[in-house]
Amino acid sequence: MQLNVNDAQAIEVSELTFGGEFNETLVHQAVVAYMAGGRQGSKQQKTRSDVRGGGKRPWRQKGTGRARAGTIRSPIWRGGGTTFAARPQDHSQKLNKKMYRAAMRSILAELVRTDRLVVVQDFAVETPKTKDLLGKLNNMSLTDVLIVSDAVDQNLYLAARNLPHVDVRDVQGSDPVSLIAYDKVLITVSAVKKFEELLG
C-alpha cells in the first residue's frame, strides 16, 4: 500500500503494519496494560493489628452493660485500624510481545484510515525555540500533535518541551497511549521505515 507524504512523493509501505484491521479489544488491553505498568502501587494503610496500642481490653467482657470490646484499635473505633486496608501491590499486567506488536500495528492502521497520520520527509527546527516550532506547526494546521522521528532531535525536543499539546518521541519511545492521545501524529519517513522493521 502507499502512504501520502507532505510535499513529496508517496511511499510504499507494508500492508501488514499500516493497512490491517482495527482490533479495539486488543488495543484496549494494550492501553490498560501500559497504564497499569505506570502505577506506583505503594499505597498502604494500617489494619487493626498495625495500629500502635490496643493490647489491653478497654473493659471487662461482662457486667458493665456496655457492648463488648476487646481492643481500642477496632475499625469501628475512632483511631482504630482500617477494615480492608490497602497493601502495596504490583499492578503490572503481562502482555505478550506478539499481542503488543499487533496492537501497535492496529493503532497505526487506524491512524492512516482516519487521516490522523501526517507523513513528512523530515521534520526539524534549526534552533531550540518554541516560536519556530509553533510557526511550523501552524503552517501545517497542527495544534494537538505527537511528533515521531527516527531519533529525537535535541533542538526539536527543547522547542516542544513547553507546549502542552505537543510531544516529541522517537520510534522506540512511542507507546499505545501516546499514539492515540493526540489529534494528529506527525511522523517522518525514516520513522515509518523503522516501525515497519520493528512491527513487521
Curated annotation (Swiss-Prot):
Indicate, by first and last residue, each region the UniProt record lists as having compositional bias (Basic residues).
54-65
Return the Pfam families for the record. Answer: Ribosomal_L4 (PF00573)
Q: How does it assemble?
A: Part of the 50S ribosomal subunit.
Family of this protein:
Belongs to the universal ribosomal protein uL4 family.
What does the record give as the organism's lineage? Answer: Bacteria, Pseudomonadati, Pseudomonadota, Gammaproteobacteria, Pseudomonadales
The biological process GO terms on file are: translation
The task this protein performs is described as: One of the primary rRNA binding proteins, this protein initially binds near the 5'-end of the 23S rRNA. It is important during the early stages of 50S assembly. It makes multiple contacts with different domains of the 23S rRNA in the assembled 50S subunit and ribosome.
Q: Region (Disordered) spans which residues?
A: 38-68
Its recorded name reads Large ribosomal subunit protein uL4
- InterPro entries, sorted: Ribosomal_uL4 (IPR002136), Ribosomal_uL4-like (IPR013005), Ribosomal_uL4_dom_sf (IPR023574)
A GO cellular component annotated for this chain's UniProt record is:
ribonucleoprotein complex
